[in-house]
């Protein structure tokens, strides 16, 4: 079964693999400079999305600054899908002092404000919390990526499917 997801001009699950470039910096200024660099790049048209890595930011959990930063990145790169990610240390994220509840609250804020097109939620962050965020995301039009980073092994396909918290509906063709 093939499932498509359309965000802005980008159709995920259709055509070619998508190119996502991370925005990684400690400050809002560093992130904005990287977004400007992408915009000015001759290869900018090949980039489908940018991933703002919140686990590197020193500004968190200052929601006001985060909201302005996400809005500025979206303004600089209006054609790019904006993915927001806070990766926990256990799954390869930067070693900042974010507890699982803090990561949940930050992700929930971004989803409720719809300041990003997509938010990455770690599969094992808690089923109840993940389901709650997925429900809010559907209401707000924010797409969710459920991720799991196992650095020891790659599970077989049936295990990956069984880990899913979401029952995927019938496939759809992109518009």
What do the PLM-derived regions correspond to, one by one?
Residues 17, 80-81, 142:
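A structural micro-motif
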Residues 21-41, 47-132, 152:
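Active-site beta->alpha loop and helix N-cap motifs at the rims of alpha/beta catalytic domains
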Residues 166-175:
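Single conserved hydrophobic/aromatic residue that forms the stacking wall/gate
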Residues 127-140, 146-165:
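Redox- and metal-dependent alpha/beta enzyme cores, enriched for Fe-S-associated oxidoreductases
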Residues 1-31:
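N-terminal amphipathic alpha-helix/helix-capping segment at the start of soluble metabolic enzymes
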Residues 11-14, 111-113, 165:
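Solvent-exposed alpha-helices and their adjacent loops that cap or buttress functional pockets
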Residues 9-13, 70-77, 133-141:
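Surface-exposed amphipathic alpha-helices with a cationic face
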Residues 53-54, 146-150, 173:
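A generic structural motif
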